[in-house]
From Swiss-Prot:
Its EC number is 2.1.1.177. S-adenosyl-L-methionine binds at L76, G108, F127, S128, K129, M130, T131, F132. InterPro entries: Alpha/beta_knot_MTases, RlmH-like, tRNA_m1G_MTases_N. This is Ribosomal RNA large subunit methyltransferase H.
Length: 159
C-alpha cells in the first residue's frame, strides 16, 4: 500500500518532527509512506472572507497538483466523519481489498481546505470536533496510521 500525507506549511517544531519521523520509521514495515509539504500562502492575520477564500484556493491548488489521479483522497476536516481506530483500520484494509492501493491524506493550512480540495476528496475524516494546529494533527495522523496497521495485522497496540 502507498500512503501519501500532504500538508500545507513546513513543519517547524522539532519535537513534532521527531515524533513523525519515529512513526514514519515504524510504518515503513507496513506501507510505503510519502510525506509532501506544500508552501503555505503568506497572508496578514486579519483577512476578509474573500481573501481567506483566495488563500485556501492557492494552497488547495498546490495540494491538488501533488495528488495522483488514481489516489483515494481522504481530507482531514472538522466536519468529516469521526471513526474509532478500529474503524479507520478497517477502512484502510477495505480500500486495499478493493484495489485502492494509493491513499492520500490531506491536511489543510491554518485556514482549512479549499472547496476544490473538498470536491476532489473521496472521504472527509475528522479526529475531533475541536480545532488542532495542523502540524500537531499530522503527528496524530501518523500515529493513527501506525495503529491502524497494527490492528489490521492483529498485532498488539495500546488501547
Amino acid at each position: 500500500m502507498n500512503i501519501t500525507i500532504l500538508s500545507v506549511g513546513k513543519l517547524k517544531e522539532k519535537y513534532i518532527k521527531q515524533g513523525i519521523d519515529e512513526y514514519k520509521k515504524r510504518l515503513s514495515a507496513y506501507a510505503k509512506i510519502q510525506e509532501i509539504e506544500v508552501p503555505d500562502e503568506k497572508a496578514p492575520e486579519h483577512l476578509s472572507t474573500e481573501d481567506m477564500r483566495l488563500v485556501k484556493k492557492k494552497e488547495g491548488e498546490r495540494l491538488l497538483a501533488k495528488i495522483s489521479a488514481d489516489s483515494y483522497v481522504i481530507a482531514l476536516a472538522i466536519e468529516g466523519n469521526m471513526k474509532t481506530s478500529e474503524q479507520l483500520a478497517k477502512n484502510i484494509e477495505q480500500l486495499g481489498t478493493y484495489g485502492k492501493s494509493k491513499i492520500a491524506f490531506i491536511i489543510g493550512g491554518s485556514l482549512g481546505l479549499s472547496n476544490d480540495v473538498y470536491a476532489r476528496a473521496d472521504e472527509l475524516l475528522s479526529f475531533s470536533k475541536m480545532t488542532f494546529p495542523h502540524q500537531l494533527m499530522k503527528l496524530v495522523l501518523f500515529e493513527q496510521l501506525y495503529r491502524s496497521f497494527r490492528i489490521m495485522r492483529g498485532e498488539p497496540y495500546h488501547k
